[in-house]
């Protein structure tokens, strides 16, 4: 795989959360949620971040997307330093980066139909007409093996594997 470009390069990533105590909410320590994590993902490479519950997998992903700011370390996506981007530039960059959880039930709003869940990233990142959104939603749902009828269902009406396909569709639609 050495001939493939590095798409994501994470170097010495650390994410700490302050522990506050007392009446004045003074910081009395830190939870070390992510401690010195480094890895690279190359083009055409499949990557899975695995570990026991509470070990920092989700926090690592959210930190890479800068939904949580890193305490220290470096994050490069396609050669660009994500830590140097302002909020708007990072929001735009997130179109190219998505997290897909093993069972994404918690990340799918239970009050939204699959159609609405798939429209949401389109509304966030693009200015499309309703007809344009309908076309994109239909195309991506079929690409991940969901029928048009399933677009009107809610996340709890799907199996774990089907919910994962919905999450993958959300990641790909942007």
Question: Which positions does each model-derived feature cover?
Answer:
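ABC transporter nucleotide-binding domains
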Residues: 1-174
